[in-house]
Amino acid sequence: MGSSLTIINQEQQKKLYKNLEGKWVIELDSEKIKNINDFCIAIMDEIDIIYDYKHLYGYDWYSFRDAAMESEHIVKKLFGDKEANVVIIYDNSKLIMSEIDRGISYQYLIALMQWWSNKLNLEIYLVFDNMTKIFNSKIIRDDMSNEDKIFKLEENKNIFIMDLKQNELADEFIKRIDKNINFSNKKEYVLIFNNSYNFVQGIDYQEAELMANKLIEDILLKKNKKIKIYLLF
């Protein structure tokens, strides 16, 4: 199973719709998502299909986690014996939410990549039209045991490695990236983060949302480079 989050534009979004047969498609309507509460409601209404946690406990991070962790039952209900492929499309071009809320929403999506990694093939597409010149940069969820394979796959690229095991503060995380990578080379960049549990629930959510925002908006969107980020668990 694999999980990825890819930056695309609206033209690529149109092409994406041509290849969705047999997949569970979740579309998040940014026009209806003004804050993180709206986002939580939108994503929960899509994935909470087993025990209806949202009505038992309300719409929050913990209900979202509990609903997502029912991945085995979700596969049986929606796919049976067929391959379980899920596509989430979120057009976030207008950046309506506050920066803090956007960071939390990215943390939700990254957590889903980890929680569903053993049962479902998850492809997340964030649509950011007219906000970057370079598209198809992405975040890939993988296992730490595959680190050597990743090195071989990405050789001859600008590779940066960072272990997050002792990293609990977003400020430290951001400073280490800014100090070690200037994104001035023309070659593709590959960022590898070991022990990426901080993005799921390893640290305070306010720190995690700042880290997630750094990866998606500051790096994937604003650097205008072809970038691939591996979050290893």
Positions of PLM-derived features:
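N-terminal intrinsically disordered, low-complexity segments enriched in P/E/S/T
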Residues: 1-55, 59, 63, 71-233
